[in-house]
């Protein structure tokens, strides 16, 4: 039985969003909104505290998996494997297809568990000299990196995908595989749009190309791909076995909590850098800690919402308006990611806030997970988030030019959300 009125939950969520927009630390903003929402909704101090504790407990599964993913991400980034993958793709596709090479390399690097901001930082020094040589603009290459990153993100073991999989109690690999077609559409749209704007905006100056003084000995491409390939194979093992009705393999269920670190460690040994295990895994953990804290904060506000009657109110409103409940999944992902300017936080909050309501209107758990996850990449790049500024800095782009790129990013994200909605909302 709900103990919190829906209005309190909504007010708490709005307060959290306003605090985030005012540059308050997102973790404190989410906790603050949760406390205020619980009290306004009529809960006692004790009940509010218990709802928040229950909410944070509900995200612990995602927290553990995100921490585990830090092993793989840390090894790929610190060993130079991610950079080697990008270099090889750009080199093989050549100057004539530089935008496709940039988008594809960004997609692959993000798909194996690297955050989009980090992907842009890795790919930018490789892309800038080639882009200047062929005469394409900053806007074009940045869109290629961002669009490719968005496409990779929805099929990656990144926090947003982990959170929606856990929130709807489906396998991580199912969500990753389920978003594959939308991701391919996103990659194609990225290439087309980036090509169309390749002569628009500022050209790259010689002085803006960073000097690449790197004493790190990077692994060969084959060795760099060992960890990603093993991760993909192990994650896909059970879903593929179920699809093909292979009884023996379908009974083998290995959680991402095991798969991602194991893949990373095997990759590390394959690259001959076993002596760097502590250094790389520590770096990976440090990269994941901000996301872990946001997960806990999002769990707090989700706890308040789950103890309210908001889901019932949302379902009633949808039924009264006659709008298909299918649209609630992508729209919630879009709005929450826009409010928080974060794919991960948006996906987490959308799942916790609207998950029950989405299931109540008849949407299957896997469909809901994929649609929220793709919706979360539509307008997650707004200026009140770190990604907006980090991506601009990677290519030395001023704020005015960076703002002009936002509609094109939304076109890419929107193409993936629309594709997912058509497939999982109407075709399946």
Predicted features and spans:
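Long, contiguous bundles of hydrophobic transmembrane helices that form the permeation core
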Residues: 2-9, 13, 36, 40-41, ...
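Alpha-helical transmembrane segments of multi-pass membrane proteins
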Residues: 96-109, 134-154, 175-180, 184, ...
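Hydrophobic alpha-helical transmembrane segments of multi-pass integral membrane proteins
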Residues: 67-68, 92-126, 296-298, 321-363, ...
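Core transmembrane alpha-helical segments of multi-pass membrane transporters/permeases
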Residues: 28-31, 47, 51-83, 108, ...
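Membrane-core helix-loop-helix motifs of multi-pass transport proteins
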Residues: 128-225, 364, 387-424, 428
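Short helix-coil transition sites and intra-membrane helix breaks within transmembrane domains
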Residues: 22-26, 60-62, 73-83, 110-122, ...
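Re-entrant/interfacial helical elements at transmembrane boundaries that shape
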Residues: 71, 84-86, 117-130, 158-168, ...
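Membrane-interfacial loop-to-helix junctions in multi-pass transporters
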Residues: 3-7, 57-62, 89-104, 133-141, ...
